[in-house]
Amino acid sequence: MIWHVQNENFILDSTRIFMKAFHLLLFHGSFIFPECILIFGLILLLMIDSTSDQKDIPWLYFISSTSLVISITALLFRWREEPMISFSGNFQTNNFNEIFQFLILLCSTLCIPLSVEYIECTEMAITEFLLFVLTATLGGMFLCGANDLITIFVAPECFSLCSYLLSGYTKRDVRSNEATTKYLLMGGASSSILVHGFSWLYGSSGGEIELQEIVNGLINTQMYNSPGISIALIFITVGIGFKLSPAPSHQWTPDVYEGSPTPVVAFLSVTSKVAASASATRIFDIPFYFSSNEWHLHLEILAILSMILGNLIAITQTSMKRMLAYSSIGQIGYVIIGIIVGDSNDGYASMITYMLFYISMNLGTFARIVSFGLRTGTDNIRDYAGLYTKDPFLALSLALCLLSLGGLPPLAGFFGKLHLFWCGWQAGLYFLVSIGLLTSVVSIYYYLKIIKLLMTGRNQEITPHVRNYRRSPLRSNNSIELSMIVCVIASTIPGISMNPIIAIAQDTLF
């Protein structure tokens, strides 16, 4: 009898929870329709994996890619709509947030075809890999629209947990296990630091958690210039710094890049920076509105350290992935210039444009590294010597992406950096822009050093890895070629396309 009553109570409680969830989706689902599509795709992946055999593997890729493409389409259809706040103020939808969500979806859409051949050759578990990628994408999208401190903490944790699992996906690899352990420990420490900063912000504002209400609370309590806000700013800057990985919060980056599977590195190298940049712009610009000079100084220090250390240490690297890790540290220094400039002088517009180009340049480079690594089993920069003699298409496409990363004209990277530096110069960041220009010249050196190796034709310099190089017989090679071609074309867009891209980005400002 007791069991029967408990069972009825359980059914009633479950029904209430289901009805409440249905009510939320019914009245708020339109605000998170792209996210709902990804959730539906995740459910389909689980259902197919639990009810089918290995012959349905192409369906897993198809469902993942289709859900991402439909989410992008839903975002584009919602473009230019009025800003909306939903879920009791926890989530905000506007053009500024949506363009960052678009960039995250674009990264994931390009990373899935880039991963197909790698997964087939290494016999990795496919379903779990796709589930983690989609869930991380979902966490990044929620972070872009987060409007309160709780959501800003929970959303990146969703992204981070999937990132830890992806980085340690090849559990038999000692380097992967070591990288995951460092990533997990430093990620947990940074989350604790971030929450501690939030607690100071929460207390100083009189118990408010919504971003705009925090500003109102600071005005009401007259605490906007208090030491507590300075303490909160320091802790939050350190916490967000781990996600952006500028120096000196970069220690995890080279090890994770080197030890993780290459498609995972490609995914994390762009999505984490896009999501963290979206979060940083909102946190610094809204709750710390009265401390703008203080957080500008903090970010300027991070940008200078990142540009100098990242590009100088990249010169000494012998591993291709570690070189790109330090290169990404330098690249985030350029992005921080746009965050500092902010809403004035098109700072956000230039930052968004450069991040779009950075996605194409970086993913195009990693697509070539995946192809070369699967055929040779090496990641050493010297082993790329003479690749042009065996695979001219791979060598030329890699060279174009590297030149674009270095910022040589007339490639997209040059015009992206030019507009970003010009906005910083107009905002009076003369020293910061000068450091950016000098370190860009340094980055060109180590990129050209790799290109020289690629194009060398002397037999004594060609390594055995290149001599034994063979093209892949797998049909899945077409998917990585497609992803690479898209990235290379986007990386070589001439400057004539800058004006419409900048114009679209300007429409995303607050």
Curated annotation (Swiss-Prot):
Catalytic activity: a plastoquinone + NADH + (n+1) H(+)(in) = a plastoquinol + NAD(+) + n H(+)(out); a plastoquinone + NADPH + (n+1) H(+)(in) = a plastoquinol + NADP(+) + n H(+)(out)
Membrane topology summary: Multi-pass membrane protein
Phylogenetic placement of the source organism: Eukaryota, Viridiplantae, Streptophyta, Embryophyta, Tracheophyta
Protein name (record): NAD(P)H-quinone oxidoreductase subunit 2 A, chloroplastic
Keywords: Chloroplast, Membrane, NAD, NADP, Plastid, Plastoquinone, Quinone, Thylakoid, Translocase, Transmembrane, Transmembrane helix, Transport
Domain of life per record: Eukaryota
Keyword Flavoprotein: no
Record-listed E.C. numbers: 7.1.1.-
InterPro entries: NADH-Q_OxRdtase_suN/2, ND/Mrp_TM, Ndh2_N
Database matches in HAMAP family: NDH1_NuoN_1 (MF_00445)
Organism the protein comes from: Buxus microphylla (Littleleaf boxwood)
A biological process from GO: ATP synthesis coupled electron transport
Localization, UniProt: Plastid, Chloroplast thylakoid membrane
Subunit-structure text: NDH is composed of at least 16 different subunits, 5 of which are encoded in the nucleus.
Transmembrane region(s): 24-44, 57-77, 99-119, 124-144, 149-169, 183-203, 227-247, 295-315, 323-343, 347-367, 395-415, 418-438, 484-504
